[in-house]
């Protein structure tokens, strides 16, 4: 699972996920990519599940880059616990995704196979995404 080795603070405030991606919206490594169309939150399990499904489909040929990293802790209180007594313990690690952010990039496989693999991966994600190529890289959506 993806998570930071160490953080300055254990817990973080919730915050708001508004606006568009100001970084990570162009292709940097691969030829084809998966780009977020709407805002959402992705956790380490979802990233790993999508990565495994895409990697299995391309039969470990080519290369996949994960362009997101869950560095924000989400807390949760235990079940059947009364309110109060402080903030809960860290439950999972997430990253806020804004529209336009690239999630995965892929290279070294035929485009049709890459599209099929990324389609399998996008079904594992909790927000709408689309598949883009190098020509479409500069568009936000």
From Swiss-Prot:
**Is Transport among the key words of this record?**
no
The family assignment reads: Belongs to the universal ribosomal protein uL16 family.
* Transmembrane feature ranges: none
One GO CC annotation, please? cytosolic large ribosomal subunit
NCBIfam families this protein is in? rplP_bact
* Pfam families, alphabetized: Ribosomal_L16
Annotated protein name in UniProt: Large ribosomal subunit protein uL16
Give the record's subunit note: Part of the 50S ribosomal subunit.
Q: Which UniProt keywords apply?
A: Ribonucleoprotein, Ribosomal protein, RNA-binding, rRNA-binding, tRNA-binding
Question: Where in this chain does the entry annotate a coiled-coil region?
Answer: none
Highest taxon of the source?
Bacteria
Q: Which SUPFAM superfamilies does this one have? A: Ribosomal protein L16p/L10e
Q: Name one GO biological process term.
A: translation
* Name of the gene this protein is made from: rplP
Q: What this chain does, per the record?
A: Binds 23S rRNA and is also seen to make contacts with the A and possibly P site tRNAs.
As one GO molecular function, the record gives: rRNA binding
């Amino acid at each position: 699972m993806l998570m930071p080795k160490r953080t300055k603070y254990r817990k973080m405030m919730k915050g708001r996920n508004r606006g568009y991606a100001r970084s990570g919206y162009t292709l940097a490594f691969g030829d084809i990519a998966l780009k977020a169309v709407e805002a959402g939150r992705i956790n380490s399990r979802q990233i790993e599940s999508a990565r495994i499904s895409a990697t299995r489909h391309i039969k470990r040929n080519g290369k996949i880059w994960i362009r997101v990293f869950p560095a924000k802790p989400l807390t949760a209180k235990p079940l059947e616990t009364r309110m109060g007594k402080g903030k809960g313990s860290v439950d999972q690690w997430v990253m806020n995704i804004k529209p336009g952010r690239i999630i995965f990039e892929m290279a070294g496989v035929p485009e049709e196979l890459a599209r099929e693999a990324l389609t399998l991966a996008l079904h594992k994600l909790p927000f709408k995404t689309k598949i883009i190529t190098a020509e479409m890289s500069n568009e936000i959506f």
